[in-house]
């Protein structure tokens, strides 16, 4: 099944009004903090347990269901609750069950043929049949409901990117296929936020999917009216007859990992243009890119290498990933985590090729390096909170530097693949916020509300500016590059790995500019300027993807 555009669709167009879910459920960890119906934050004293209002409490009958049996693993309780809601809240069409349920593909035959999950589906179906007091002779319908959820449900994120739970939408959305280079994305709004509240001036709403109505035979909004609403938005220009696509997974992965992810979650292999490209697309080549350096040009302290390049790269990847996992599991402290990861990023690993010693380092855009930057920015920020007063500023500074470098890397990837806009927006926003927090630590008497101006970017925020996104981003990045000329060496001081890069948007390993002495006031002003440009660029990308803007950038008088 697929959905195609009936006519040309411009970039930054919402493809249809918000869709209500057929069924949804919070993850267990958010049941006590968010409304189980609309996913909004609960008030301090909610009128009803687990719900923000009496109206929301009437929409959900199964939150207090019996204890889930352990046999349902790896199926999550949220999957079971969503399946229960699906069977309870809709007039279920069983005519093509178990292969389809309410026009949704279930993948029942594939999932039940997989011994790693079929037993869990069977136990979960029996559990659901008991809860709803089914008197049917078999649990085929319950199995179909679970399979429909596993195949079609999407993870619901709040405005900060936090995964709150899952939701299942009708075929108006579920028939939109996956691509690793999609032309659209989707976002969520809750019932407390009207569609017009999140609709910005430059956003259009399309009714250009008549083909969708003809194929689906369903209303665009045939959900139950409750739960997080979904909006699909174009992030590229879409030609008439072109298929509408979104991404089901994290796109900042090389082809092999994406294929594995899609198969484990959705039981299909992607054959989109990016996956089928031979040779691999540029973004996939650098997501697995390594640099081979002559041994004499490297420093001491390498890890034991091997005689096989792929094996050596695998060792680097595994070592960094193990350090990240140990840090996230609290098995190592932030300081140890930083030392372990940075030693591999900076020194690389030795290996022999044709009896000659060489050194391998991960490309700055390598997917493992991206995860490392995220972890290092977090670890250094924690160290800034836990450290003695004398090094708080240093830890905050390096945390901001890693976040800014990650933003620069994401821009490089975004230039090659426009569907990376979602990730890039998040990274630039995080960098801007960390730099914004850093500024007052550099000079306490200088207010962050100081008059920070950039005349070059002054017109980018005006409502009558219709310049192309490429032109706007080019101007912002030009300013970032200029400001970094005098700020990058200060931000990266004491961090050997980042010190070797020319700037956060230039990954050349040769530094041409020596560190320039600046007063604390100059440093603070430049950090604020850098922060404002990061937030401005994040707003540009967020508007592209979601039609929304942050309020942080308004603090600066650009």
From Swiss-Prot:
Where does this protein have coiled-coil stretches? none
Quote the CDD domains the UniProt record gives: SET_SMYD (cd20071)
Q: Which InterPro entries match?
A: SET_dom (IPR001214), SET_dom_sf (IPR046341)
Alphabetized, the UniProt keywords read: Methyltransferase, S-adenosyl-L-methionine, Transferase
> What's a BP term from Gene Ontology annotated to this protein?
methylation
Q: Where is the SET domain?
A: 115-249
E.C. number, please? Answer: 2.1.1.-
Q: Which GO terms describe its molecular function?
A: methyltransferase activity
Q: Name one Pfam family in it.
A: SET
Asked if the Swiss-Prot or TrEMBL record annotates the protein with the keyword Endoplasmic reticulum, the reply is no
Which protein family is it in?
A: Belongs to the class V-like SAM-binding methyltransferase superfamily.
Name it. Answer: Protein SET DOMAIN GROUP 41
Identify the gene encoding this protein.
SDG41
